[in-house]
Design a protein with these regions (language model features):
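ATP-binding pocket architecture of kinase catalytic cores
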Residues: 21-127, 131, 144
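Short secondary-structure junctions
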Residues: 14-22
Length: 173
């Protein structure tokens, strides 16, 4: 009810018809909202600094992704709230991912090639190797019970990075 009230209070609605909770969302809650015959997705979530999740970055990247044609239009945002156009779609299952790799890979390539050119502002980095290093330091500095996996994980990360960097035209430098 608290989330529904938050959604209802947003100043963008003309004739709010329905709010439906959507499954999924690892670090946020998602809702499908019907308003005046159109549908939007409302994402509610806060920053999670220990996991390098900053909602302000989602806004910057969402705008860039929309500009290159791989994401819905950002309709509205405020702290903790992101509203996007709804796109009728189906969540891919592992089998459908495998069956459609020839369509998926070019989209991922486009994301990595074109989004960096469209970014504005100063987004925090969410680069996989930096994140691994960050988590490693976090485990060390907080005397984590998971510290035993740390050195093995760092070694694997360095090996993967080195392999990727050795590939021609690598975009993950």
């Amino acid at each position: 009810m608290e989330f529904e009230n938050k959604i209802k209070s947003l100043p963008i609605w003309k004739n709010l018809e329905n709010i439906e909770h959507l499954e999924g969302g690892i670090t946020n809650l998602n809702f499908l909202v019907s308003d005046s015959g159109s549908k939007s997705v409302v994402r509610l979530g806060s920053d999670i600094p220990e996991h390098l999740v900053y909602r302000s970055n989602e806004i910057i990247v969402s705008e860039a992704a929309y500009q290159i044609g791989v994401s819905p239009k950002l309709i509205y945002n405020e702290p903790g709230v992101l509203v996007l156009e709804f796109i009728e779609s189906k969540t891919l299952e592992p089998k459908t991912v495998r069956e459609n790799l020839n369509k998926i890979v070019p989209i991922i390539r486009k994301i990595h090639d074109e989004i960096p050119n469209k970014l504005s502002g100063q987004p925090q980095i969410f680069w996989v190797f930096y994140v691994i290093k960050y988590y490693s330091n976090y485990l060390l500095n907080n005397n984590s019970s998971h510290i035993f996996i740390n050195s093995k994980f760092i070694k694997k990360s360095r090996k993967v990075r080195k392999t990727l960097l050795s590939k021609r035209n690598c975009i993950w430098s």
